[in-house]
Amino acid sequence: PSPLKKSLEKVLQQESEVQNHLKKVMKRGVGSMEELLNIQMSVYRYTQHVELLSKTVDRSTQCLKQTLQTRL
């Protein structure tokens, strides 16, 4: 698989993990401060990967547009 596909799969996996953490907390409440920190860390990693992936896609799109414009 391409690096982009791997990145997308990782982001989707992290999104699922974050959702599972939040569902558990919503069902039974917060067990400890450690649990809250784990959730915060998961959300932070997820948002960082989404941001990086977004920048990668944006730059790829810009390069593609530039390439298409120079060919015309």
PLM features per residue range, with description:
Residues 2-72:
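Amphipathic alpha-helical polymerization modules
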